[in-house]
A protein has these predicted regions:
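Short coil-to-beta transition motif at edge beta-strands of beta-rich domains
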Residues: 2-14
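N-terminal cationic leader/targeting segments used for protein routing and processing
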Residues: 3-5, 26-28, 47, 62-65
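N-terminal non-cleavable signal-anchor helices
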Residues: 4-6, 24-25, 41, 52
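Acidic surface patches and DE-rich sequence motifs
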Residues: 11-13, 30, 42
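Short beta-strand-centered aromatic/proline hotspots
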Residues: 18-28
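Short aromatic-glycine-enriched beta-strand elements
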Residues: 33-38
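Intrinsically disordered, low-complexity, charged/polar segments
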Residues: 40-67
Length: 67
């Protein structure tokens, strides 16, 4: 999976809320499940308040967006 800084994804959660994920950091020295740092916004545009870390396993569940 090719991920770049600036890529954006949408996670469609089971509770019906869509979360916007903006990749802000990629660190190959982190564990596989924490490789990508991202800002996360809820469906109302509210920022989660901290960078969250994900791996390819999570991003494969998300939809990559064009913008």
């Amino acid at each position: 999976m090719k991920v770049n800084i600036g890529d954006k994804y949408i996670f469609h959660s089971e509770n019906g809320m869509d979360y916007s994920i903006h990749i802000v950091n990629i660190n190959d020295f982190r564990p596989d499940n924490e490789r990508y740092g991202a800002d996360v916004y809820d469906g109302n545009g509210n920022y989660a308040g901290d960078v969250m870390f994900f791996g390819d396993d999570f991003l494969q569940k998300c939809e990559k967006t064009a913008d």
